Amino acid sequence: MIPRAPLVLLLTLLFPTLRAEVRVERVLLPEGATPGSFAVALPGGVNFCYDPARGGLSYVWTGGFLDLAPARPGPGKFIAPARLLGPVVHREEGPAPLRRGQPAPAPALTFTGYTLRPAAIEFRYTLDGVPVREELSARPDGRGLERRFVPAGGGDARWWHITEGRPPAALGRDAAGALILEVSWEGAP
């Protein structure tokens, strides 16, 4: 009988989308990611690069997570970006994509931390001094992300999601008052 730890490692290598927990790496990432960006793997094979300097997704990829060998080559070796183990399926650009009140100008953003959840990750930051919690989780079908924004103030304000090259999108609220943004990609239902 194979001991549990090697069996889990073997299954993860053979079937990278079978992850049952959230995984976070903070390494040099490809595809134009800024230094300090987070690579996050969600259960079901949905992975993304989150830029804490701009408070938003940089890109999403599906399938396997990361090949970390180039980013952690050992002493005296050249460090290169980690390799994505799947295709990039969604990109977002532009500063501070979450906006309060008016779509312009970009607010002052300060990243304050993150918390791992059973099947999600929650990032915390302030926008013009207003504390915001943003929870990202994979859709059950694995073909998109759900982003839940919970601002501590400004409940009466209109909130926007701004991405370069797209028109501003007003965010709606769920029954609990959280702002909801569904992110899907080409071929997703």
PLM segments and residue spans:
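Positively charged n-region of N-terminal signal peptides that target proteins for export
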Residues: 1-5
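Short, well-ordered beta-strand segments enriched in hydrophobic/aromatic residues
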Residues: 145-153
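Bacterial N-terminal signal peptides
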Residues: 6-16
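Beta-strand-rich N-terminal accessory domains
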Residues: 20-146, 159-161, 167, 172, ...
